[in-house]
């Protein structure tokens, strides 16, 4: 079973979301997602300043197996991207919940968080796959 940190929120598309002290949200892909994709070779990051809607594809993770879209779990403005992934995309594999984060978003509609899964619900989703 994949590691599913209790403090995070999750999307059905296997992104995770963590609220930061400054009110922004850090987004990445889950350990389960990176296990399915395999070794990362490139991450196509979104543009800082871009406005996205929940469910929009805004980044791409390319692995030795496949390229997979990464979706915005909430609507808002991209305020930062993880530039370290340009040189070290494998951070998504080795540290999916830490240094392997993909982007930060300033949510424009925090009520969208209610549609995300908590750790228990995400674990149940994984068991059903």
UniProtKB/Swiss-Prot annotation:
Cofactor(s) annotated in UniProt: (R)-lipoate
GO CC, alphabetical: cytosol; glycine cleavage complex
Source species: Salmonella arizonae (strain ATCC BAA-731 / CDC346-86 / RSK2980)
Function: The glycine cleavage system catalyzes the degradation of glycine. The H protein shuttles the methylamine group of glycine from the P protein to the T protein.
Assembly information from the UniProt record: The glycine cleavage system is composed of four proteins: P, T, L and H.
Gene, per the UniProt record: gcvH
Keywords: Lipoyl
InterPro entries for this protein: 2-oxoA_DH_lipoyl-BS (IPR003016), Biotin_lipoyl (IPR000089), GCV_H (IPR002930), GCV_H/Fam206 (IPR033753), GCV_H_sub (IPR017453), Single_hybrid_motif (IPR011053)
Chain ranges of the Lipoyl-binding domain: 24-106
Full protein name: Glycine cleavage system H protein
Domain of life: Bacteria
PTM-bearing positions, type N6-lipoyllysine: 65
Cofactor note as given: Binds 1 lipoyl cofactor covalently.
GO biological process: glycine decarboxylation via glycine cleavage system
Family stated for the protein in its record: Belongs to the GcvH family.
């Amino acid at each position: 079973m994949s590691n599913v940190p209790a403090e995070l929120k999750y999307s059905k598309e296997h992104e995770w979301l963590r609220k930061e002290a400054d009110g922004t949200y850090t987004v990445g892909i889950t350990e389960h997602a990176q296990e399915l994709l395999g070794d990362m070779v490139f991450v196509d990051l979104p543009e800082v300043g871009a406005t996205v809607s929940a469910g929009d594809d805004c980044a791409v993770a390319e692995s030795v197996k496949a390229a997979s879209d990464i979706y915005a779990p909430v609507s808002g403005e991209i305020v930062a991207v993880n530039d370290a992934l340009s040189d070290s995309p494998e951070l998504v594999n080795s540290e999916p919940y830490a240094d392997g984060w993909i982007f930060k978003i300033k949510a424009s509609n925090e009520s969208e968080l209610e549609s995300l899964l908590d750790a228990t619900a995400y674990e149940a989703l994984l068991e059903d796959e």
